[in-house]
Amino acid sequence: PEWLIADIAIMNAGGISVPIFTTYAAGDYEYIINDCSPSLVIASNNTQFKKIKKFVENIKVISFEKLESLSLTTSEIFKKDLKKNINRNLKREMPCCIIYTSGTSGNPKGVVLSHGGILSNCEGALDLVNKLLENKKPVFLTWLPLSHSYEHTIQFIQILVGAKIFYAESLEKLIPNMIIAKPTIMTA
């Protein structure tokens, strides 16, 4: 859930979210960081931070856990008055996120998605999802990487339908996770 919280917070502050796969090679991280020029990087943990450390030396880094080097944790951020950082002027045509492809044919390519584009995708899928969930409590088991463009959009549909969301630990643990979560819907 931390990823979703961070993603929505970035958008709410008027920023542009740039989710990246945790499985990228070092060169891909370097390329993406240089390409999108982030003003801030969120590293989920020390393992992920170590992968990007040498590429973010001059960029502020925050994390949900204390990192090995100087950083700001989310608990420190939550102590601040965040109301002044809310962007109340978001427009449908404004960039929401940049999703990078896997880079199978060269460097990863960034695709800019607007708030309106994501909303249109959600609106288009909502009727179908509501029909699938008719007379059921919505329980999603998310198993695609959250940096995947499809899963990135699905997270908003999950919120719109008031779903309980479970996150699969890994593809290898998908079946045991299904037994625990008892999802009423899974997407792929």
Language-model features, listed with the residues they occupy:
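Conserved pre-ATP/AMP-binding loop-to-beta segment of ANL
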Residues: K79-Y100, N107, L133-V139
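ANL superfamily adenylate-forming
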Residues: T47-R92
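Adenylate-forming
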Residues: A43-K50, P183-A188
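Short beta-strand->loop structural element characteristic of the AMP-binding/adenylate-forming
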Residues: W3, D7, M11-L40, G110-V112, ...
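Conserved AMP-binding A3 loop
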Residues: C96-C122
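Conserved AMP-binding/adenylation subdomain of ANL enzymes
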Residues: L119-V139, L146-A188
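Conserved AMP-binding
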Residues: P1, F21, F140-H148
